[in-house]
């Protein structure tokens, strides 16, 4: 994560977000382990008035299969109270929402907003079919293994000193 404070490369800020181009990103290739899981920061993007950071959580196939099997079994068991639904969600490997903070030399910037892309090679719930194509496109764009589950969070940070200027 230390590379984020050293963001110096100038990139065209007029990019279109829905069409991801390889020359729009500053490749980071930073990885770290948190809570015994592998996480990656594949790229950083400039946005008007700020910066966007992609953070990817890797879900190995065996872990994904075990969690989703338990999740499906409990979900299909019949009526569930709100408390039981919350208990079931603990087995959903995609049910995770980090809150991003960008540390700079003088400040800590909280995430402005975020998007989540879920890649589930098993195509079992809870990922919906409408999420499938954009997530696959993003996983292929970064060269991630399609046989592994991925949750990619795109975290947006706003700040005047993060702006890309000519």
Where do the language-model regions lie?
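Alpha-helical, hydrophobic structural elements that either
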Residues: 1-166
